Amino acid sequence: MKNKMKAAAASIIFCIIFVFCFVKCVELLENKSARVQYEAFFESETNFDVIFLGTSHMYNTVLPQELWNEFGITSYNWGYSNCTTAENYYILQEVLKYTEPKLIVLDMYGLLAYENYGNGKYRTDRIEQQHVQFDSIPFSLNTYRASKDVFDDYSGNLDFMFNFIMYHNRWTELGEGDFTVTPSTQKGASFNVGLQQDAEFERLETDEKMEIDTVCYQYFLQILEYCSENEIQLLCVYLPYTASAKEQMVSNSIGEIIEAYDFCDYINLLYSDILNLKTDIYDSGHVNYLGASKVTSWLGDYVLENYNLSGHADEETYSGQWNTEYEEYVQYKMRTISAEKELYNKLLLIYGDEFEADLKILDGCNAEKEDEILSELIAELSDSISVEYVEELSLEDKKYDILLTIKRGNEIFDVVGYEYQNTQTIEYSY
């Protein structure tokens, strides 16, 4: 009898150790992007008043930490690269299990973009991107339905329920980031650093529309019905970027559709005057940090004015956690600024009320006059930058044409010199 009890106990202990080791192996081998992006959502001690959903347009444009700093709004950005409306239909239902937002904001880009990929519900050539969001969500009946529906033509759709199937052979890919995971400080968002020169936007008339009949459009209608039936406030938004003619026609066609649904509204920001095409564009589909900050500020004003929201900056239950995490975000921005080499990128990153810059230009240097982008950036930063012309400039015994000093309060954390060259193109060397 004792031997049987010992054998049973040994079996139980073995099973416990095996399960523990298996779980740890699963955690080690999984792609850590999901934890980096969404761990802060699941571990938050406070509610989120606003949830943002959508594609990379939302992911790169709306910055929750800036919303907190300016308005005291608590929000999380669940947008991600190539996240389709079909995926958002299921992600929305999962997110609502963990927080009780007063408003859902849905990015409208993508109603046409994915129609020529497989079943039209996801990017067949971006499976790894689709995993980032679904890997973060605990298994449920809803995720099972999503894997069988959205990825119905993908032979490995079980990966989206049990991601160990996909990642079990990552042993050779493991790096330092797999052993120490640092969650993003951006509350799901990710701002772009860079500037597209000569960006153009050929605006259509708002009455130029088109019929939308795509797979993702059908899921968009399901989202409208879901929010309307459950009395969830939904704001659909077409975020600003240099859209094509067809994309503009889609943006012009959405409003009439949404009017038929209670609790659902629509704003089209493609034709707003929020962006400066000379300073705010990252590429043909996205804005940079400067553009994102402007759009975020505009949306903050809009939702406070039009929805039942108020700031939490003076509430202890919110301010402790959010102020601490905002400071971590600012420190991340400071590291990003210091690591950046390009003059334009440093300047666009100091937009806002956190940083100040002193820009010294050597007498006789015509950079401000000859470089339209530089002069536009200086104008955009008028509240936080001072420009001074001096007779001599040097840094560490090297002479420069331009010297940029960036500080936060009284702390100078970045100083860099540039030589200005204007031949056929304008260039800055450092």
How should these model regions be labeled?
Residues 47-49, 72-74, 100-103, 228-235, ...:
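Loop/turn elements at helix/coil->beta-strand transitions in domains of secreted/extracellular proteins
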Residues 27-47:
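Alpha-helical transmembrane signal-anchor/signal-peptide segments
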Residues 249-326, 330:
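C-terminal regions of proteins
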Residues 6-26:
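Hydrophobic membrane-insertion alpha-helices, especially the h-region
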Residues 331-430:
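Short acidic-hydrophobic catalytic motif
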Residues 121-229, 312-333:
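Secreted/periplasmic serine-hydrolase-like ester/acetyl group-modifying domain
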Residues 53, 57-142:
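Membrane-embedded segments
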Residues 190-257, 261, 266-274:
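Flexible, glycine-rich surface segments
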